[in-house]
Every structure is written in C-alpha cells, then in structure tokens.
Amino acid sequence: MRTYLDLLQHVLDHGVDRDDRTGTGTRSVFGYQMRFDLEEGFPVLTTKKLHLRSIIHELLWFLKGDTNIAYLKENGVTIWDEWADENGDLGPVYGYQWRSWPAPDGRHIDQIANLLKMLHTNPQSRRLIVSAWNPALVDEMALPPCHCLFQFYVANGRLSCQLYQRSADIFLGVPFNIASYALLTMMIAQVTGLKPGEFIHTLGDAHIYSNHFEQARLQLTRTPKKLPVMHINPDVKDLFAFRFEDFRLDGYEADPTIKAPIAV
C-alpha cells in the first residue's frame, strides 16, 4: 500500500513537532486524505504484518454494541486493555454510540440499523451517516472516539464509505482503521445487495509519535506487495449475524511486525 507509505513520508518530511495529551510528543499535519478502491484488493499493510484477528473481532464487538472488553479478551484481543477499568468497562464508546445513541426523550437510536434501512429504501440519501462523537458523553468515555464519523455513498451499484478521523496515530492505529472500515464497507455492501466501492480515509490531526520515528523509517525501506483478497461468507445476509469464521483473507504476504509502544 504505497498510499500509506506516502502518508508516513509526508508527515516525517512536512509535519510540525507538537506536544500532546500523552506527554510523548508527535510530528503531525492537519488534514490528509487517502483513497482505496476495494476492487483492487483488501487494503491491509504488507510492509508489516497486522494482527487481522484483532481487527475482525474489534469490528464485530463494535457491531454488537458492546463496551466491555470481556468479548475481546475471550478471543485473544488486547488492544483495548490499557483503557478499561477494573471491571473491563470503557464507558459509552463506539459500540454504544453506533447501536444505542441516547436521545433526549429517553429513546435509544440504533444508527447502524437505521443506516441499513436507508440503504435499502433510499440509497441516494445524503444522510447515510453514523457518528460516534457524542459531546454529552465524551467525558464518560475511557477514550473519546478517534474515528468519529463515517458516511456512505451509493453510485452505479457500488457502496463507498468515507471516514473522518479526528485523531490519527499513523504508525499503530491507522493501519487497523483502514482495514476495519474497508471490511465494514464490504460487509454492508453484501447485506444490501451492492458491490464494494471505495474507502476514503480523511484524517484531521494525522501524527506520528516521536517514539515511532525509527520504526516508521524502517517501514519506509520496505516494498509494498500485492494486496490480498478478503472472502466473506456469501450466505450471511444479516450484518449482525457475522462471526469471525465468516472471513478468510487469501494471499496475505507481509514483512515482519514492527513493534512500537502505545501512547495512553
């Protein structure tokens, strides 16, 4: 994925060095966009191996509306451990906002179910939007949503998705986000009778942590390989019925993992 390497290089060359919430320090740019045509392969990094199991289980966890890490722990996923409390709770994070956004009248809005309904009944709508950024509840979240709003677009039988990510940890987080939302787009396309189109990733504060510079430069020495193909069980027609076993990634050849510390 040359597109991702171009982002790394751009931020290293043109970013501004800034202090940040974690005290680590970053080099960042404000405003950057990447586009991935999902017909050209599944956009997962080949210049370092990603833990696909974590990506899939996290997405299924979001779609369940879950906000406790028990499901993730049961499936060997540790990416949320640093933020959970002693009971494994994270507060009203992504899954809660996606599936149970609290309305002023006491109702809870299932944004994902509403999205699916609109894709069936009014696919030309400009309101095919899901938001995880709820100002009334941000302070109750263990970590406010970094990937905070996404919109779908249907044209010529293809479903495209654009994600706005307010805060983008380029070395560790962004590769996960690309693969996760690409997969979500493919899943929703399948259950709505559409073909996958593009995934467009729009970044706000796009940053590389100062203790990731060496790792980023190592990754830039590597050559991207052909993208793998994601196969999804064609029998699944209900978005909320997908299981881990319904996904198979063929042809994934990647360079070794590059370890880097997480800024909490």
Curated annotation (Swiss-Prot):
GO cellular component, one term: cytosol
Known pathway: Pyrimidine metabolism; dTTP biosynthesis
Subunit structure: Homodimer.
EC numbers, comma separated: 2.1.1.45
Protein name according to UniProt: Thymidylate synthase
Main subcellular location of this protein, as a coarse class: cytoplasm
Record's catalysed reaction(s): dUMP + (6R)-5,10-methylene-5,6,7,8-tetrahydrofolate = 7,8-dihydrofolate + dTMP
Sample GO molecular function, one term: thymidylate synthase activity
HAMAP family reported in the protein's UniProt record: Thymidy_synth_bact
GO term, biological process aspect, one: methylation
Organism name: Brucella melitensis biotype 1 (strain ATCC 23456 / CCUG 17765 / NCTC 10094 / 16M)
Record-linked InterPro entries: Thymidate_synth/dCMP_Mease (IPR045097), Thymidate_synth/dCMP_Mease_dom (IPR023451), Thymidate_synth/dCMP_Mease_sf (IPR036926), Thymidylate_synthase (IPR000398), Thymidylate_synthase_AS (IPR020940)
UniProt keyword Lipid biosynthesis, yes or no: no
Active site feature: 146
Any coiled-coil regions, as ranges: none
Compartment(s) where it occurs, according to its Swiss-Prot or TrEMBL record: Cytoplasm
